[in-house]
Amino acid sequence: MTDYIKPYNNDPFVGHLATPINSSSLTRAYLSQLPIYRRGVSPFLRGLEIGMAHGYFLIGPFVQLGPLRNTDIKYLAGLLSAIGLIVILTLGMLLYGAVSFTNDSQDLESVDGWRQLASGFLLGAVGGAGFAYLLLTLFS
């Protein structure tokens, strides 16, 4: 075990965040397949894919745990609540991109890239939540 845990550059006074877990090739291969890190994909399509997954699973907690969970409109209330949260998340993404990046960068590391990512996220998340709503209403 002493072979794995060593000070960075054999200097115990230098901080380094690499561990055997987060610097392993398996972890790096897994993370490289996530949509945000995938090469050759436009920011809009990255946001669309991320949004579809998030919109699909955001409706469930609002349906099961929301204040209207014992009524006939629990699915509609869950859908509208999820869409409200999605809009708030999209505004947060837009603000983050506006204050963190400039327009002279490349691809996702620019204001325009984050604007595309956020618009794809909004479209995908509303679509994912709508798809989950349709499944819930059809199969319940």
From Swiss-Prot:
UniProt keyword Plastid, yes or no: yes
| The entry's keywords | Chloroplast, Membrane, Photosynthesis, Photosystem I, Plastid, Thylakoid, Transmembrane, Transmembrane helix
List the subcellular locations.
Plastid, Chloroplast thylakoid membrane
Which top-rank group of organisms is this from?
Eukaryota
InterPro entries xref list: PSI_PsaL (IPR003757), PSI_PsaL_sf (IPR036592), PSI_suXI (IPR022980)
Q: How does it sit in the membrane?
A: Multi-pass membrane protein
Q: Please give a single GO biological process term from the UniProt record.
A: photosynthesis
TM segments? 48-68, 79-99, 119-139
- Cellular component GO terms, alphabetically? chloroplast thylakoid membrane; photosystem I reaction center
Asked if the record carries the keyword Transmembrane, the reply is yes
**Family (UniProt):** Belongs to the PsaL family.
Show the PANTHER family listed in the entry.
Answer: PHOTOSYSTEM I REACTION CENTER SUBUNIT XI, CHLOROPLASTIC (PTHR34803:SF2)
Q: What is this protein called?
A: Photosystem I reaction center subunit XI
